[in-house]
Swiss-Prot record:
It holds the Pfam family Motile_Sperm. The lineage of its organism: Eukaryota, Metazoa, Ecdysozoa, Nematoda, Chromadorea. One of its GO terms (molecular function) is identical protein binding. InterPro entries: Ig-like_fold, MSP_dom, Nematode_MSP, PapD-like_sf. Forms filaments 10 nm wide, with a characteristic substructure repeating axially at 9 nm. Coiled coil: none annotated. This is Major sperm protein isoform beta.
């Protein structure tokens, strides 16, 4: 069963952080490439610490081994002088899909007893 094997690695471009540059009176969009570097199909989902300011599209999906997806992270307008800009990040969670599952994302893959891995990408705001 796929759930007894830990999920393999993913690669992201950028690899360690996302940077948004001022001015923040217009919406910014940054693209992230996620690649399934492992040997099994995975389901992945994105979480953000600030859903009011940060959006992701698509927010989840399924990747076969060595397959990639381009994801957009958008930063809505905000007032940099009055907003707390610390500790924003997106988190990519991924898990193996069950053997024989269709290539369609299902939230319950993350709610069972299978291992879920996480990668955090901090958000940096250049003023």
């Amino acid at each position: 069963m796929a759930q007894s094997v830990p999920p393999g690695d993913i690669n992201t471009q950028p690899g360690s952080k996302i940077v948004f540059n001022a001015p923040y009176d217009d919406k910014h969009t940054y693209h992230i490439k996620i690649t399934n570097a492992g040997g099994r199909r995975i389901g992945w989902a994105i979480k953000t610490t600030n859903m009011r300011r940060l959006g992701v599209d698509p927010p989840c999906g399924v990747l076969d081994p060595k397959e990639s997806v381009l994801m957009a992270v958008s930063c809505d307008t905000f007032n940099a002088a009055t907003e707390d800009l610390n500790n924003d990040r997106i988190t990519i969670e991924w898990t193996n899909t069950p053997d024989g599952a269709a290539k369609q994302f299902r939230r319950e893959w993350f709610q069972g007893d299978g291992m879920v891995r996480r990668k955090n990408l901090p958000i940096e705001y250049n003023l």
